[in-house]
Amino acid sequence: MAAPVTRQVSGCAGRVPSPAGSVTERGQPLAAAVAELPVLDASGRRVTFGALFRERRAVVVFVRHFLCYVCKEYVEDLAKIPKSVLREADVTLIVIGQSSYHHIEPFCKLTGYSHEIYVDPEREIYKRLGMKRGEEISSSGQSPHIKSNLLSGSLQSLWRAVTGPLFDFQGDPAQQGGTLILGPGNNIHFVHRDRNRLDHKPINSVLQLVGVQPVNFMSRPTVIHV
């Protein structure tokens, strides 16, 4: 196995190193300046990013924006992961968006998501971690988590924007997301940066990296024992 990358993730977009598709015990260091950046919870309370994974390993999913139909359907499947299997593996699941914190509660009601969720409204953490802006044209394959096509999904997003209490895009529509496995402490074990809206990491492949049994998302969520 190749030696893990150990350069600090310090905040230079496009230069943040990515480890291979395996999880190392120690990981690579996350710069303290990034860990100290704030996120906001649903009540607007500021929490340092590093506090979210200080004590245990966390799967952190950065979404594009809360109006994105792809993000909505992906988070709907994240919501199906039983809390009991995460507790058993001592893993925290966290979603981070980049809207105002006022949009957190409606988004959770819409998706049924009840795990941890925060926002980075200035996108500082997105930038420091090298998350892309704009969509790279590439074939990302068929996602197991997305049910809507481009037309129907876009119309749903537009309808939610128009009928919502605040007419906005609930974040920068050009921003892409990504998935990281972090902690305990300022250690990064896995990084995936989305190239476009459909390039998110399949959930079960991430769960496997943190020792969580795969989940059947096709019907009522159940753990697949292997």
Curated annotation (Swiss-Prot):
<dbReference type="Pfam" id="PF13911">
    <property type="entry name" value="AhpC-TSA_2"/>
</dbReference>
<dbReference type="InterPro" id="IPR032801">
    <property type="entry name" value="PXL2A/B/C"/>
</dbReference>
<comment type="function">
    <text>May positively regulate ERK1/2 signaling and AKT1 activation leading to HIF1A up-regulation with an increased expression of glycolysis genes and enhanced glycolysis.</text>
</comment>
<protein>
    <recommendedName>
        <fullName>Peroxiredoxin-like 2C</fullName>
    </recommendedName>
</protein>
<dbReference type="InterPro" id="IPR036249">
    <property type="entry name" value="Thioredoxin-like_sf"/>
</dbReference>
<dbReference type="GO" id="GO:0070374">
    <property type="term" value="P:positive regulation of ERK1 and ERK2 cascade"/>
</dbReference>
<feature type="region of interest" description="Disordered">
    <location>
        <begin position="1"/>
        <end position="24"/>
    </location>
</feature>
<comment type="similarity">
    <text>Belongs to the peroxiredoxin-like PRXL2 family. PRXL2C subfamily.</text>
</comment>
<dbReference type="GO" id="GO:0045821">
    <property type="term" value="P:positive regulation of glycolytic process"/>
</dbReference>
